Amino acid sequence: MSLMDVLRQQDPDLAQAIDSEAERQRHGIELIASENYVSSAVLAAQGSVLTNKYAEGYPRKRYYGGCEFVDVAEDLAIKRAKQLFGAEHVNVQPHSGAQANMAVQLATLEHGDRVLGMSLAHGGHLTHGHPLNFSGKSYEIHGYGVDRETEQIDYEEVAEIAHKTQPKMIICGASAYPRNINFDLLRTIADNVGAILMADIAHIAGLVAAGLHPSPIGVAQYVTTTTHKTLRGPRGGMIMCSAEHGKNIDKTVFPGVQGGPLMHVIAAKAVAFGEALQPEYRDYMRRVVENAKVLAEALTNEGLRIVSGGTDNHLLLVDLTPVNATGKDAEKALDHAGITVNKNAIPFDPKPPMTASGLRFGTPAATTRGFGPNEMRQIAVWVGQIVRELGNKSLQAKIAGEVRELCAAFPVPGQPEYV
């Protein structure tokens, strides 16, 4: 009897929700840029007996007994992350990317310090200074963005704002930016004003690990990331820095912002890092980028405008203004057709965020499933048809059937029960 069989017997209501989600994943196309499918091995580690163990502290420096085996799991995660990214010091305990960012900020800043981060409206992240987030409430935030014409980061503007505001920290990285980030130039800008540079690579960590995006390791003083998204691990966070900053980071994570680490999640992180160290992982990331470029070109052929004119990484932003559609309406219509994306503001968007003029697409999950350029072109055709006729329910139903047929040829990894 499988664990899911046990759950179906004991808690059928919850089991039904999980079974329904598995079915949704199996029969639909996942194009949310921050999502991916983990392997059976990652699922096995995260669902293991390590979930029973409390382990406050760090390997061989715990506040509880009986930690000799969870120490092995954390040591493996740290060792593999160091090897994967070339970092001197790694903390794998943050429960999320947001908590990793919080820990770095608390370790280096005082309340009210000035911080320069990429505006959320231009592709940044909540934890980079949004007024509703802890970062925006704790520090004096100044924002930078993209050039109105190129829709790429305006590094001259970043330098000008930094010179004017004299921030203690500059944060780079993004949640909806399709171009490479020049970490070396940002470090120069930071050095010129005496600022710390923190790089949040949550979205592009897999590309960095595979050598397909410039690495901020050894450039930024602090690098944070999530462990899911392009890394295909469990949902969690991680901090990388030089050895000299390691002790301060560790004591800020614990006991500063967290108590007991999630040892089952850390074990799953170790599994994912081990998978990312394999030669086939780089090929996977290469195909992710190729698929994103093909999808961008194919959507352009459907009459849609791609923000910044294309993509260098795993995601792209589509401006729906040429087809008189909103991101909110397009997301809903595509969802009815079995294609999952998210509405997203575009730079200088006149519409409110919950309506938005754009859609964000990402190729990591579909590529994990085995989709290639031909499937990307077919997806673009479906997207074009749907956004031009948002109210056409029969068209959405027809495409949903075609999507289901396509997905049947590409089983979802990590779901042997449901294949």
From Swiss-Prot:
One of its GO terms (molecular function) is glycine hydroxymethyltransferase activity. Its cofactor is pyridoxal 5'-phosphate. It catalyses: (6R)-5,10-methylene-5,6,7,8-tetrahydrofolate + glycine + H2O = (6S)-5,6,7,8-tetrahydrofolate + L-serine. It is found in: Cytoplasm. The record marks H228 as: Plays an important role in substrate specificity. Its EC number is 2.1.2.1. Keywords: Amino-acid biosynthesis, Cytoplasm, One-carbon metabolism, Pyridoxal phosphate, Transferase. It holds the Pfam family SHMT. Belongs to the SHMT family. Homodimer. HAMAP family: SHMT (MF_00051). This is Serine hydroxymethyltransferase. It comes from Herpetosiphon aurantiacus (strain ATCC 23779 / DSM 785 / 114-95).
